[in-house]
Design a protein with these regions (language model features):
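A generic, residue-level signal for flexible/boundary positions that often mark functional hotspots
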Residues: 12, 17-22, 80-82, 96, ...
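Accessory alpha-helical DNA-binding modules that contact the DNA backbone or grooves
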Residues: 83-214
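Charge-patterned, long linear interaction tracts outside catalytic cores
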Residues: 42-113
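Phosphate- and other anionic-substrate recognition elements at nucleic-acid/protein interfaces
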Residues: 1-74
């Protein structure tokens, strides 16, 4: 089996400061090959490293103001990143900078901590690295897979963990059921108007929790 992956922008990436920092000992051809391979594994994480003018999305893209192109791409990427979240244990600085509340300084601090401890196992652990304000803004978008708490792998903000746990308990489920078809089916049947009062929360938080648990 084989997969065809677009190589647009790979050569531009291979000579960029980011590529040189990531692979200082590799030739540009090998850096391009690595970039193309990574696109198959995680397209979003890799494509954010390429400047908009290097992506090659159309014949007339160079007629558009490069600043407008970059601003619009940044907006779209930021929405995508904050929608799907990022794996805090694998995310590059190029990806982390698109997370709400995180700038280069915060990104570097988080990565330095990650490299120091080897692996981050919980969102609570991140609280010791970020300021309270940044933590509150960013933590819902930072995901931890196979960590101490399964909710850390979802888009549920820690402030709403109690709502999630109480919801699970009220329908006879537990954290170990997260991701199961049985739980998904039960969540589909929930009367949100009834449960928002039962759980003493607002409809928006409840709908967000339900969506994230599916």
């Amino acid at each position: 089996k084989y997969v065809i992956v677009s190589e647009a922008g790979a050569s531009i990436y291979s000579t960029s400061p980011i590529a040189i920092e990531e692979f200082p000992d590799l030739a540009v051809e090998k850096r391009s090959a690595v970039s193309i391979g990574r696109r198959l594994q995680d397209p979003l994480a890799e494509l954010v490293k390429i400047p908009p003018e290097g992506i090659g999305v159309g014949l007339y893209q160079h007629d558009v103001s490069s600043k407008k192109l970059k601003d619009n791409l940044d907006f779209v990427v930021s929405k995508a990143v904050n929608s799907v979240g990022v794996n805090v244990n694998t995310a590059s600085p190029s990806l982390l900078k698109y997370v709400s509340g995180i700038n280069k300084r915060v990104s570097d601090k988080l990565i330095d901590y990650r490299e120091k401890v080897g692996r981050i196992n919980s969102r609570k652990e991140i609280q010791s690295v970020l300021s309270d304000k940044v933590y509150e803004q960013a933590i819902g978008f930072l995901r931890i897979t196979d960590g101490d708490n399964v909710l850390d792998s979802t888009g549920i903000h820690p402030e709403s963990y109690d709502v999630a746990i109480n919801l699970l308990n009220s329908i006879g489920m537990t954290l170990s059921d997260v991701g199961s078809e049985k739980l998904i089916n039960k969540l589909e049947e929930i009367d949100t108007e009834k449960y928002k009062d039962l759980l003493n929360t607002d409809i928006y938080t409840l709908e967000d929790v339900i969506s994230s648990l599916k």
